[in-house]
Amino acid sequence: MARYTGPAWKLSRRLGISLSGTGKELEKRPYAPGPHGPNQRKKLSEYGLQLQEKQKLRHMYGMTERQFRRTFDQAGKMPGKHGENFMILLEARLDNLVYRMGLARTRRAARQLVNHGHITVDGARVDIPSYRVKPNQTISVREKSNSLVVVKEAIEVNNFVPEYLTFDADKLEATYTRHAERSELAAEINEALIVEFYSR
């Protein structure tokens, strides 16, 4: 399944979650798009709830179904809770951590920064958004990319960097000090439903 490239706000409303991270998509119309307005949402079946939860998380991280399922399967081979491990692996993606650093306003924009070669890990350029960052690795903006307007604008509006990243705004770099804990990740996601979906 290809990555979704359509209207992000419409998709956010359909899934009932802010994919941009700003919450603006749901401020005026916190219901699915369509001619029937807020009264059109039907009660979902158990399968429907599981599918919706999977789609929420997949679109939140901007992944194809194949990438998403591969990461899910890898999480299942780790000790501990399958769902929590899955969330932690998703959070360790390079494009996501660039977004968490505040170098981009959305994960989609962060993925573009990585794709276009503006990001390094431990000094080496990495242009693979799905690259899994390991604890104690350092993520930086390439020196020749420091003046990018999109990065400067994103830094100006960002006021939160999670505790598992130590960010130096002057150097535009951060160290991924540890894996995220489940309590630090999206509270609106019920990963148990996703485990149930793939276990059917």
Swiss-Prot record:
Instruction: Kindly give the PANTHER family that the UniProt entry links to this protein.
Output: 30S 40S RIBOSOMAL PROTEIN, SMALL RIBOSOMAL SUBUNIT PROTEIN US4M
Entries under Gene3D superfamilies matching the protein = Ribosomal Protein S4 Delta 41, Chain A, domain 1 (1.10.1050.10), RNA-binding S4 domain (3.10.290.10)
Q: What is this organism's lineage? A: Bacteria, Bacillati, Bacillota, Bacilli, Bacillales
Name it.
Small ribosomal subunit protein uS4
What this chain does, per the record? One of the primary rRNA binding proteins, it binds directly to 16S rRNA where it nucleates assembly of the body of the 30S subunit.
Record family assignment: Belongs to the universal ribosomal protein uS4 family.
**One GO MF term, please?**
rRNA binding
Quaternary structure note: Part of the 30S ribosomal subunit. Contacts protein S5. The interaction surface between S4 and S5 is involved in control of translational fidelity.
- Domain S4 RNA-binding span(s) in chain numbering: 92-152
Q: Quote the gene name from the UniProt entry.
A: rpsD
The record ties this protein, via SMART domains, to: Ribosomal_S4, S4
Domain of life according to the entry? Bacteria
Residue ranges of the region described as Disordered: 22-42
Q: Which UniProt keywords apply?
A: Ribonucleoprotein, Ribosomal protein, RNA-binding, rRNA-binding
